[in-house]
């Protein structure tokens, strides 16, 4: 073997060794699993209750205009439609969503949850933030008085006129807080659900109920005989109440869900869905 051949063989061995070292080094430092933190969030990367699925809770029952026909999986109704759009932004299809039901009070109580996010007109409050996380708001609403045309409340134009009238409201809600502040507690009846409050109005147990404005218009037009939206309560009409998704405290999904809501707001989807499902809810006088 000549000296030049020996040199060529040594150079080849050196090149192979260098290539092997580069390959091993690249493998050692390649991000895997949770180490690949700089990668964009995808369905597979999100931490959810059920792998590859997004579990969304809503009320039992869920009412229009928020959920049509108590069927959130249809993506019909404002909150159902927004939720399907949020899921899509997160990388989930409509079929990847698992819809479950939950009690309103338990959803905002401390402790573990068996869902990823919950949607049933939750207002953002500092007190609730101590127990759960909130996403960015997807809608801003006000609180309103709804009644029937034969009720003494139907002709009211001021808050003072309503203070001596039996009024119903659902417990542990922003509607209850506003009703308590504006109307006092002497004639305020508290119920476990809006369903119960509506039944009390229909039976004559109360003369009016307090609900958010879109729900008031829905009840007046589709549920109550000769229903009427008396007006908005003044304390809730300046700025309004921000509705958002509730997530378990410290959830890894809080930021991705907020980002999805923000993106839907920026691209006009939220406005479009609001017009489609809540478009007729603006014309109600503010009670003085």
Question: Residue locations for each model-derived region?
Answer:
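A ligand-binding cleft/hinge motif common to bilobed small-molecule-binding domains
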Residues: 106, 122-131, 180, 207-239
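Bacterial lipoprotein signal-peptidase II cleavage site
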Residues: 27-38
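C-terminal motif of bacterial Sec signal peptides marking the signal peptidase cleavage site
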Residues: 22-26
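Acidic, polar ligand-binding/catalytic clefts
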Residues: 96-161
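Extended ligand-binding regions for polar small-molecule ligands
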Residues: 28, 80, 85-89, 173, ...
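Periplasmic-binding protein-like
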Residues: 60, 140-147, 221-262, 281-288
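Extracytoplasmic small-molecule ligand-binding "clamshell" domains
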Residues: 36-118
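Bilobed "Venus flytrap"/periplasmic-binding protein-like clamshell domains
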Residues: 56, 75-89, 122-123, 140-196, ...
């Amino acid at each position: 073997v000549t000296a030049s051949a020996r040199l060529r063989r040594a150079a080849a061995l050196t090149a192979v060794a260098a290539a092997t070292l580069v390959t091993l080094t690249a493998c050692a430092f390649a991000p895997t699993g949770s180490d690949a933190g700089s990668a964009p969030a995808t369905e597979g990367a999100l931490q959810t209750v059920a792998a590859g699925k997004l579990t969304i809770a809503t009320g039992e029952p869920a009412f229009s205009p928020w959920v049509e026909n108590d069927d959130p999986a249809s993506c019909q109704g404002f909150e159902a439609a927004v939720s399907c759009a949020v899921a899509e932004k997160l990388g989930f299809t409509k079929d990847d969503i698992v819809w479950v039901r939950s009690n309103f009070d338990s959803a905002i109580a401390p402790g573990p949850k068996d869902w990823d996010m919950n949607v049933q007109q939750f207002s953002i409050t500092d007190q609730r933030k101590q127990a759960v996380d909130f996403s960015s708001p997807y809608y801003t609403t006000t609180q309103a008085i709804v009644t029937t045309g034969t009720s003494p409340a139907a002709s009211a134009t001021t808050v003072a006129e309503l203070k001596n009238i039996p009024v119903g409201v659902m417990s542990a809600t922003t509607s209850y807080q506003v009703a308590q502040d504006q109307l006092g507690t002497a004639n305020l009846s508290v119920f476990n659900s809006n369903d119960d409050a509506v039944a009390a109005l229909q039976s004559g147990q109360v003369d009016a109920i307090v609900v958010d404005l879109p729900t008031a218009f829905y009840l007046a037009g589709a549920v109550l005989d000769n229903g009427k939206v008396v007006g908005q309560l003044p304390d809730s009409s300046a700025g309004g109440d921000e509705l958002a998704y509730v997530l378990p405290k410290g959830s890894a999904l809080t930021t991705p869900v907020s980002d999805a809501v923000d993106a839907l707001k920026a691209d006009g989807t939220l406005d479009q869905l609001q017009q489609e499902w809540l478009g007729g809810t603006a014309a109600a006088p503010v009670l003085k």
